[in-house]
């Protein structure tokens, strides 16, 4: 039969064949490279088949459709074999192929293929229907979900430190960090009626001198009829809790520069003085006070009634936290979390700049008189004598491990529990002293009155991955073998949740030591084992090429090539010059949001993440000096190139992303989940978050694709069987049924909600409040909003 070579007919066939040929060449060449470094054979085989399809299309043979149908079905079989019926994992393997298959069965396309082949069109239609059926089934049957139901049984727990039901007077509602409210006016039956009650705008936005890492992470506190909150620049606001109207504000006039690694404030602390322990001058000056940490190294006491400085505290209300520090340059020491407040003591820790040099300021923990600001004690984790008080001739220790996340406090035991970070530089540790290693990445229990060590437990030995304890620990009394045990839950970046008796630091849930990958960079070492808690969200298997992802099979192929080029032998693979895949990544499976524990039901709500990072050590050379230049400043971010002056390597730290900027690991990257704390089992786990606000173009309507997004911020839970969480990279506050994880409601936020919400009652009405100000390095929309939600008056 003669081929009709009319211009329009031939052009369409030629373009179709050209597309197939280009796809085939890409898959063949890229796939050959992948096979050469140990990856899957699928891609070069698919490339050869695609080139065969292109040749047949060029020859106008309808048999191309038969061959393409075989490729499509083979791809679906291979995809299910690699990843199961996981919709988001199957999508990049099949999306381009399905769309091209649909193109080929369009009448104006296949009719131009004038050399017939019996049943070719029907074969491709069947292949497309089978592929569509597999994807549809996968879309409604998520293999990553766990679908159980928590017991509703609840026994009222004795409060460790009583808090009025209607209040939220501390960062985690109580200083035990439970993030649980006994309020139940808003409950699982009526939360779908929740409406915006009021919005307050702080006016605090990014300034020209700010670094990229400016973040709005505050959880407000509420005492009586007033809400207290700080902004990214630590401006303090007092709002009417019912209307959201400003009562007063205080501006510490923070002066930042681009070297600050953080510009943020997670919260403030509240103290009410008692006449039996405070002087008459204190009682007259500031009986109720707000304690405000400021990123330049100040701690400020402000009258809770009127916003004026407490004149009897420290230097007319301002305490200099840089006193006796070994390096006082602004931005190197940054208190970003609210301190613990006892009847006598303010327990203050702070953040230090990560990965800058071996001559950084100290991570010392200090106790100050809550009324006067006088230094009562110090615990310098890197000093030979941690409790030694410095003088004008003797400073605190360079590069002591720091505790940057909020701490927890047991008033009955008078113990404060601090989640510790690692000695910086973080990613190479060959020169660390035994003192610097001793308490790094540990839970540290100190007597809050004296600063003396009660006990410590190390969660990562010789930490080379920045696997700090990043979250406020949570204290609760939990039933173990029929007996109530006072425990502490410490979520770690590794995904482990370490559970210890908070009286003595003994493990309640086993955490056996297990072998980990060996082979550190030159001059460094790796410990042979690490502890692995049996209560954990850490990955159940190591990553493989099959876990790589992308928008299409083409960038997925690039991710697979990158994966096989890096060093990766599972969790705790040592940093390397080759580049090491770090999973869980530097953001961790847990971050500063922590977990929420209902002490009555003995259940916990958690929101773990799963986003790999890549660390690559950079040997010293031109442009990468070992000695710190005199004018050197911080990088203003925790990612990218970090100098690590004083050790043999700089380092680059970045998320593991595709050429399109998408995570190279397949979704989910974020979950919401519930734990039964009596059995230590994950009862339910769901993906949380959509790509709506991560798209390259605005999406004015909700996107129904629940992928499971990265997040920063934590959950809260209530006696109404409802949990609330924002945190995700899309701008929503969501409510879930605590018992089974069913999403009950979501409210659109005007900016990123990378904060933990809180709830309270005033004038008989329950409110839920969230900061919606965005997160600079997370890339969410920036703003200055505080948003409150409540039920309409006619809803009960």
From Swiss-Prot:
One of its GO terms (molecular function) is ubiquinone binding. It is a multi-pass membrane protein. Residues 1-10, 59-62, 111-118 are cytoplasmic. It is an enzyme of class 1 (oxidoreductase). Residues 38-40, 82-95, 142-796 are periplasmic. It catalyses: a ubiquinone + D-glucose = D-glucono-1,5-lactone + a ubiquinol. The active site is at residue 466. Gene3D superfamilies: Quinoprotein alcohol dehydrogenase-like superfamily. It comes from the Bacteria. One of its GO terms (biological process) is non-phosphorylated glucose catabolic process. GO terms for cellular component: membrane; outer membrane-bounded periplasmic space; plasma membrane. It is found in: Cell inner membrane. Its EC number is 1.1.5.2. SUPFAM superfamilies: Quinoprotein alcohol dehydrogenase-like (SSF50998). The chain crosses the membrane at residues 11-37, 41-58, 63-81, 96-110, 119-141. Belongs to the bacterial PQQ dehydrogenase family. Monomer. NCBIfam families: PQQ_membr_DH. This is Quinoprotein glucose dehydrogenase. It comes from Escherichia coli (strain K12).
């Amino acid at each position: 039969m003669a081929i009709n070579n009319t211009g329009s007919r031939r052009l369409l066939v030629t373009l179709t064949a050209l597309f197939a040929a280009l796809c085939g060449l890409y898959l063949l060449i890229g796939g050959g490279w992948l096979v050469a470094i140990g990856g899957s054979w699928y891609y070069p085989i698919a490339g050869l088949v695609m080139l065969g399809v292109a040749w047949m299309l060029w020859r106008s043979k309808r048999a191309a459709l038969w061959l393409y149908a075989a490729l499509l079905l083979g791809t679906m079989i291979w995809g299910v074999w690699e990843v199961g019926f996981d919709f988001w994992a199957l999508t990049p393997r099949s999306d381009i192929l399905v769309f091209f298959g649909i193109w080929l069965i369009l009448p104006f396309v296949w009719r131009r293929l004038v050399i017939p082949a019996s049943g070719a069109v029907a074969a491709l239609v069947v292949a497309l229907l089978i592929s569509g059926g597999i994807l549809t089934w996968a879309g409604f049957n998520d293999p990553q979900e766990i679908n159980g139901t928590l017991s509703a049984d609840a026994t009222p727990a004795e409060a460790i430190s009583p808090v009025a039901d209607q209040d939220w007077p501390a960062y985690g509602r109580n200083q035990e960090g439970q993030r649980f409210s006994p309020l139940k006016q808003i409950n699982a039956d009526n939360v779908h009626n929740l409406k915006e009650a009021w919005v307050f705008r702080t006016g605090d936005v990014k300034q020209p001198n700010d670094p990229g890492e400016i973040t709005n992470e505050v959880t407000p506190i509420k005492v009586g009829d007033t809400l207290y909150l700080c902004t990214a620049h630590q401006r303090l606001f007092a709002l009417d809790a019912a209307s959201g109207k400003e009562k007063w504000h205080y501006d510490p006039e923070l002066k930042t520069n681009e070297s600050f690694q953080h510009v943020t404030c997670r919260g403030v602390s509240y103290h009410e003085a008692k006449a039996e322990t405070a002087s008459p001058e204190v009682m007259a000056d500031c009986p109720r006070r707000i304690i405000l940490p400021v990123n330049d190294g100040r701690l400020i006491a402000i009258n809770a009634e009127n916003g004026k400085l407490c004149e009897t505290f420290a230097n007319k209300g301002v305490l200099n936290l840089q006193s006796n520090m070994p390096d006082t340059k602004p931005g190197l020491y940054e208190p970003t979390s609210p301190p613990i407040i006892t009847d006598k003591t303010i327990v203050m820790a702070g953040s230090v700049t990560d990965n800058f040099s071996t001559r950084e300021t100290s991570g010392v923990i200090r106790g100050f008189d809550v009324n006067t600001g006088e230094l009562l004690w110090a615990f310098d984790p890197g000093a030979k004598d941690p409790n030694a008080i410095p003088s004008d001739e003797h400073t605190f220790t360079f590069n002591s491990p720091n505790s940057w996340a909020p701490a927890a406090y047991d008033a009955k035991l008078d113990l404060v529990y601090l989640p510790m970070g690692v000695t910086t530089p973080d990613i190479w540790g060959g020169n660390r002293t035994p003192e610097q290693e001793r308490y790094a990445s540990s839970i540290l229990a100190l007597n809050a009155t004296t600063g003396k060590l009660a006990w410590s437990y190390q969660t990562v030995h010789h930490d080379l991955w920045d696997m700090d304890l990043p979250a406020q620990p949570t204290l609760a009394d939990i039933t173990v073998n029929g007996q109530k045990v006072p425990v502490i839950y410490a979520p770690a970046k590794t995904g482990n949740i370490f559970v210890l008796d908070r009286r003595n630091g003994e493990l309640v849930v086993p955490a056996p030591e297990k072998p980990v990958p060996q082979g550190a960079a030159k001059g460094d070492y790796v410990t042979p084992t690490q502890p692995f808690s049996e209560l954990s969200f850490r990955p159940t298997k190591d990553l493989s090429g099959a876990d790589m992802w992308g928008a299409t099979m083409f960038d997925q192929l690039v991710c697979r090539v990158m994966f096989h080029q890096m060093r990766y032998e599972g969790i705790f693979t040592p940093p390397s010059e080759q580049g090491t895949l770090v999973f869980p990544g530097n953001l961790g499976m847990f971050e500063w949001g922590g977990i929420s524990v209902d002490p009555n039901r003995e259940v916990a709500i958690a929101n773990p993440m799963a986003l790999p990072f890549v660390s690559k050590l950079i040997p010293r050379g031109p442009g990468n000096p070992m000695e710190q230049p005199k004018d050197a400043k911080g990088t203003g971010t925790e990612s990218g190139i970090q100098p690590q002056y004083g050790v043999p390597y700089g380092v680059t730290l970045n998320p593991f992303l595709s050429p399109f900027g998408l995570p190279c690991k397949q979704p989910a990257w974020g979950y919401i989940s519930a734990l039964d704390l009596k059995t230590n089992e994950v009862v339910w786990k769901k993906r949380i978050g959509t790509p709506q606000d991560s798209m390259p173009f605005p999406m004015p309507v909700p996107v129904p694709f629940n992928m499971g997004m990265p997040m920063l911020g934590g959950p809260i839970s209530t006696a109404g069987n409802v949990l609330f969480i924002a945190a995700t990279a899309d701008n929503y506050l969501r409510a879930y049924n605590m018992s089974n994880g069913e999403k009950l409601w979501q409210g659109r936020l005007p900016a990123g909600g990378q904060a933990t919400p809180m709830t309270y009652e005033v004038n008989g009405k329950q409110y839920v409040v969230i900061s919606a100000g965005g997160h600079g390095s997370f890339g969410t929309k920036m703003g200055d909003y505080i948003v409150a939600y409540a039920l309409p008056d006619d809803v009960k």
